């Protein structure tokens, strides 16, 4: 079949007892037995990824990280989007070549030098998992804060405590975890419905911002819209030079746009995965980036007073809601916030869904303690319920950061952006360096643009890794409460897992493991169709896994 995998160079045939299609044949060639039902279409996995992207709630949640850093200008979104799209396109090409739920770590295991493959795979797994495991709690936290902000807006005497925020966030997490355990067909339908709502609500709130804009009536002496110079100008709110602050503001864009990897991790749940998964990645990043940019323009031309949003005079705790109060009547503020809350819930549910499938895939490869428990799939629903439970427990522990204050809990946003970027780009870095002449692209590929786009994405990530660790203040103003704790939390985790690998895990961790039973593998047997294209349906009792040329030494 010409696929590089953990079964490459072994000249084997796999016995099967049922008719299989091209997707299952490719997965067997990669080294995994089909355990999950393929009931997701291109639209379904795009639905999940677009819901994980969650533009409306993401933009609302990231006001602190963009508008309150360099002002209302949409320029940071535009510039960052160009480079983020290059990262996504490079990932799409990787997903087409290795369409399995293990995602980027599996690709790293096949593209890295053999001597370092196990460690680089280990590093990528933990990096990607730290991105995935912080997604759902950060979105659930944002959703809870918006709900409580809406309560404060309607009842000014109400001020939410940390315990109330934690309790409400936990309630959202419980509901999302419960729904992630449903059968795949139900989850697919719910995800599709969630995407429809997210798109509709995004359009509705966009129209409400422009059509319901009454800022000239709410505040005297200003026009209905800002001038071009005001809307596009930079207003440095940080203590760094404007250029550095501009780069720091990319964090909001990176976090808001970080859901495009979901189709990769759902590849084992969709049909025609080698084409559908990369297409969904491209659609998510491109469509999401353009729509988000339009939304940024709407905000730039209507925002009234950044200082008021930063000061939060009504103690709402949500800059986006404070922004809405500057331009809308009370009823419209309530309506727009309510729609954002609903979208945020759909986003949280899909984040937990995608992350649980990542946990399942990594447990299958033995990454975690007690992996034998976490990798089990429910025979009734054919979903990884134990992985959902594990994620829920870890995410609840992360949410205890709520009691440390806004900056502490805010670290899960920046960790997600940093870790995601690193894990997304690792296979691209290997593809354009060590495996430059040996990488065999899948049916969806970038052709002659593969290497240039790959270098652009790697260079951008290399620039942004240290930038994402910068606080917005410096000098005497840099106190523990204002510190950016991303570097400590993320690199602390990586340090601990690296020590674990060197001391113990290197003895047994070899990267992705096949879950195909030895009884079903025949070594040294060649078949006539070895190396042929994968057929749509295979009507036999044997599947030949080509003894592909030894491409990764």
UniProtKB/Swiss-Prot annotation:
Transmembrane helix among keywords: yes
Chief place where the protein resides: membrane
Listed Pfam families: AA_permease_2
Signal peptide start and end residues: none
Listed transmembrane segments: 43-63, 68-88, 133-153, 163-183, 190-210, 240-260, 280-300, 333-353, 397-417, 453-473, 485-505
Cellular-component GO terms for this entry: membrane
Keyword Nucleotide-binding in record: no
Record's subcellular location: Membrane
GO molecular function: transmembrane transporter activity
Membrane topology: Multi-pass membrane protein
Protein family membership: Belongs to the amino acid-polyamine-organocation (APC) superfamily.
Protein's name in the database: Putative polyamine transporter
Organism: Candida albicans
Encoding gene per record: GPT1
């Amino acid at each position: 079949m010409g696929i590089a995998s953990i079964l490459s160079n072994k000249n084997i045939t796999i016995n099967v007892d049922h008719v299989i299609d091209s997707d299952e044949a490719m997965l067997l060639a990669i080294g995994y037995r089909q355990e999950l039902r393929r009931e997701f279409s291109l639209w379904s996995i795009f639905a999940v990824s677009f819901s994980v992207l969650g533009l409306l709630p993401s933009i609302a949640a990231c006001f602190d990280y963009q508008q309150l850093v360099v002002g209302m200008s949409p320029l940071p979104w535009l510039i960052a989007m160009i480079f983020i799209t290059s990262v996504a396109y490079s990932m799409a090409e990787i997903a087409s070549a290795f369409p399995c739920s293990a995602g980027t770590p599996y690709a790293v295991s096949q593209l890295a030098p053999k001597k370092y493959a196990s460690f680089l795979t280990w590093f990528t797994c933990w990096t990607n998992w730290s991105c995935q495991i912080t997604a759902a709690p950060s979105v659930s936290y944002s959703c809870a804060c918006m709900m409580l902000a809406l309560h404060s807006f309607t009842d000014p005497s109400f001020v939410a405590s940390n315990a109330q925020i934690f309790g409400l966030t936990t309630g959202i997490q419980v509901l999302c975890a419960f729904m992630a355990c449903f059968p795949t067909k139900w989850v697919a339908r719910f995800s599709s419905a969630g995407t429809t709502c997210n798109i509709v609500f995004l359009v509705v709130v966009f129209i409400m911002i422009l059509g319901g804009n009454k800022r000239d009536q709410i505040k005297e002496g200003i026009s209905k819209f800002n001038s071009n110079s005001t809307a596009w100008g930079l207003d440095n709110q940080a203590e760094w030079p404007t250029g550095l602050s501009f780069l720091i503001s990319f964090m909001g864009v990176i976090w808001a746009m970080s859901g495009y990897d979901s189709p990769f991790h759902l590849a084992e749940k969709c049909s025609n995965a080698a084409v559908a998964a990369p297409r969904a990645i491209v659609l998510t990043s491109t469509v999401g980036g353009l729509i988000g940019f339009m939304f940024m323009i709407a905000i730039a031309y209507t925002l009234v007073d950044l200082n008021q949003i930063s000061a939060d005079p009504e103690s709402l705790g949500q800059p986006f809601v404070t922004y809405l109060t500057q331009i809308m009547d009370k009823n419209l503020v309530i309506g727009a916030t309510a729609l954002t809350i609903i979208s945020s819930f759909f986003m949280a549910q899909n984040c937990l869904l995608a992350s649980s499938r990542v946990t399942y895939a990594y447990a299958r490869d033995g990454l975690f303690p007690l992996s034998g428990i976490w990798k089990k799939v429910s025979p009734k629903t054919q979903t990884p319920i134990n992985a959902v439970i594990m994620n829920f427990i870890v995410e609840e522990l992360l949410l205890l950061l709520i009691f440390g204050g806004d900056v502490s809990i805010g670290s899960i946003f920046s960790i997600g952006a940093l870790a995601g970027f690193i894990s997304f780009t690792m296979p691209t870095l290997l593809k354009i360096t060590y495996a430059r002449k040996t990488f065999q692209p899948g049916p969806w590929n970038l052709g002659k643009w593969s290497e240039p786009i790959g270098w652009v994405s790697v260079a951008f990530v290399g620039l942004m890794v240290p930038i994402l660790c910068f606080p917005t203040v410096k000098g005497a103003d840099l106190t523990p409460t204002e510190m950016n704790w991303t570097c400590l939390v993320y690199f602390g985790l990586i340090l601990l897992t690296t020590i674990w690998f060197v001391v113990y895990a290197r003895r047994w961790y070899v990267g992705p493991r096949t879950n195909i039973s030895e009884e079903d593998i025949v070594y040294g047997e060649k078949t006539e169709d070895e190396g042929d294209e994968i057929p749509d349906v295979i009507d036999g009792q044997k599947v030949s896994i080509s003894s592909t040329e030894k491409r990764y030494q």
